[in-house]
């Protein structure tokens, strides 16, 4: 079992709860309440900002030029379609301008932002990888249901499409390989710290989804 497999197994509880969360299920069913979805997208925008900052730290902390390029290419993609989607979706959902320009973070959003910010500030490459992997692997699993038809609503369908597909699968596979590689030379204490960080990220991502219904 690889180290990334170990982390995924350790986070099995919050992982299962997040990938079958009410919000995810309702998106797949095409019946999520517009107000709740709009509120969630506002919170996603707050997280996206710190997520991009963390990607910048990962770019700076990379130990291999080819890895730095892979991170940089992905950061450019995240700054494009996902950010554009949030703006368009909030237009369609009539999210008030004040909520977009002066958003108030929910408690779980604030905690997730704090985690992203602290890992960014530390600029430790394996730690950056652990958080990025937990976040995006969880997104991929949430948006992957081989036997399910995607929703017909274009906003909901695009929300899923941004979290899956060959390019996104390749990104998650890259993060797994990088974390497996960079963690191989670490001692048990450092690997345990990465395991705890991965688990904490999964727990906060679950709490972040819960925030849509508070």
Give the ranges of each region predicted by the language model.
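Secondary-structure edge/capping motif, primarily at the C-terminal ends of alpha-helices
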Residues: 55-62, 119-120, 143-150, 182, ...
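Hydrophobic alpha-helical segments
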Residues: 2-3, 7, 115-118, 207-210
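Acidic, carboxylate-rich catalytic segments that either coordinate divalent cations
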Residues: 193-214
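Active-site-proximal alpha-helical scaffolds that flank and shape metal-associated catalytic sites
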Residues: 42, 66-170, 199, 203
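Acidic, low-complexity proline/glycine-rich segments
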Residues: 1-24, 165-177
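Long amphipathic all-alpha helical oligomerization modules
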Residues: 168-198
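Alpha-helical bundle segments that constitute or directly flank the non-heme di-iron/ferroxidase center
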Residues: 12-18, 31-61, 127-141, 209
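Short, charged/polar, low-complexity loop and linker segments
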Residues: 24-29, 116-118, 181-188
């Amino acid at each position: 079992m690889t180290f990334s497999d170990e982390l995924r197994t350790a986070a099995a509880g919050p992982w299962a709860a997040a990938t079958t969360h009410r919000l995810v299920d309702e998106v797949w069913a095409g019946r999520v309440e517009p107000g709740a979805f709009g509120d969630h997208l506002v919170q996603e925008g707050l997280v996206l900002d710190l997520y991009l900052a963390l990607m910048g730290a990962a770019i700076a902390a990379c130990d291999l030029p080819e890895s730095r390029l892979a991170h940089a290419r992905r950061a450019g993609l995240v700054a494009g379609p996902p950010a554009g989607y949030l703006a368009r979706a909030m237009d369609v959902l009539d999210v008030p301008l004040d909520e977009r320009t002066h958003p108030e973070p929910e408690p779980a959003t604030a905690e997730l932002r704090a985690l992203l910010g602290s890992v960014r500030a530390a600029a430790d490459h394996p730690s950056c990888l652990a958080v990025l992997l937990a976040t995006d692997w969880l997104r991929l699993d949430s948006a992957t249901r081989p036997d399910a038809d995607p929703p017909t609503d274009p906003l909901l369908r695009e929300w899923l499409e941004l979290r899956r597909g060959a390019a996104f699968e390749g990104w998650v596979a890259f993060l797994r390989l990088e974390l497996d590689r960079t963690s191989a030379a670490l001692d048990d204490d450092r690997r345990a710290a990465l395991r705890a960080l991965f688990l904490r990220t999964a727990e906060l991502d679950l709490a972040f989804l819960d925030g849509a219904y508070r």
